[in-house]
Amino acid sequence: FVGMIAGGMRIAGQLGGNEKVQLLSGLFIATLPNAVIQASNTESSNIVAFWILAMASLFLDWLKARDRENICKLGCCIGFAILSKGSAYVTAFPFVLAIAFFCLRSPRKLLLQGIAAAAIIIALNAPHLARTYQAYGSIVGGTERNILYHPTPGTLAVNIVYNFLLHEPWLLKGPLLGFWQGLPAALGVDVNDKTIFPWRGLEEYEAQFQVVDTVTQNIIQAILLLAMPVSIILRKFKTPWTYSSLVGATFLLYWIFLTWHPWAGRIHTSMFVLAAPLAGLYINSWPKKWLQKTFVIILLASTFLVFQGGLRRLSIFDSNERNFLYNTRNYLYFNNYKHFDQDYINAVNFLASQHPKSIGLEIYDDSFEYPLWAFMADSVREMPRILHITSQKDRDTLKPEFILALPQGTPELPLAKPHILERKNGEYVKVFPVTEDAASSDKNQQ
């Protein structure tokens, strides 16, 4: 989170912004509700956003120097961004395209640099891509529902509007909701088409300000980003052409190729922080200083609202069990699932006592496996190798010592209790949780 703020401020300086612009850019990120919430959980949105910002900053350095050191660092940042989250393919692509353009325009001087950067990106991701292809038969893994394979002007328009509405729930009240729900049909887009809306449309989105891991709205920042292109069109704001074009292309590619879903807002973090330096320049361009100061106060005040709700609260006056000033991170993992925390802790304690070298992970589409690895890191000297198991063939081929299974729960209890299987005599036998019959059998053997 701190790295994102520093990265945004550095880019603002690279774009010619003074100290005030840099501070405004940092403030834009520091008060971004999505980023604040993601900074205190196990999601990877902030991680990929940091690498994307580092990539953008190094791109500007390389654009000026055209040197090998910066292009190699640039390749590392792109590689780590992609390794952190698949959405980085879209976010980084305009910058990759720009690098390729400049390298091909001066092949004698820059082509080898471009090849070196590409080699670094591939080397960092090759093991993961190979394993993903082995498990799913595709390098995109199980993310097919996130990709819009047949985009049209209609799907683009709907995606732009619906993604903006994710951050402005107040626009989904009363008759406005019916208007937005009717927009896809008016543009020739079938809201029941699962290739376009794999998780249905706006009826699945709760139209209220929320502070949770999957849904947190950037209300103020989204309005500011909408105002920027309007000001550019009206010639009220002159923006750095190269950087703003790349940021705009990132937003455009996202709207064209990624499907909409109610919790897509958390994926927007990378794009919001990329736009932060431009936001700093934009706020600084306002002729009325009182308006700038008022906007800064609004940003700061909105942050307090973020800390007062949701799963993890921050207030010296609030001793609520969700307040992370008074509770450990491990405790806060289970704010929504208090009846499961001990099951996870017991499973980790059991695995740690066995000192495994490898653990197979069998999960369904949306399993809650994050706490397991956080707990495990605190319980063992050396983390075991984690292997994703998707079939019996994987079990036979990879042969992990233990398999940690997180089956799908029920609508009433969405999380199922973890089960652990141990490989014995070539077969996997359930060893946790210990049943009464198994415990009795062990005693008899002893």
Residue spans of the language-model regions?
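Membrane-proximal, lumen/periplasm-facing interface regions of secretory-pathway glyco-
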Residues: 300-350, 365-368
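Transmembrane-helix motifs of polytopic, lipid-linked glycan transferases
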Residues: 1-15, 54
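Short acidic/glycine- and proline-prone juxtamembrane loop motifs at membrane-interface regions
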Residues: 37-47
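Hydrophobic/aromatic-rich transmembrane helices and adjacent perimembrane loops
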Residues: 45-49, 81, 90, 137, ...
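Signature aromatic-anchored transmembrane alpha helix within multi-pass, membrane-resident enzymes
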Residues: 20-24, 73-76, 92-99, 114-122, ...
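Membrane-interface anchor segments at the N-terminal boundary of transmembrane helices
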Residues: 37, 175-244
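Membrane-interface transmembrane helices that cradle and orient dolichyl/undecaprenyl
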Residues: 14-16, 55-70, 103
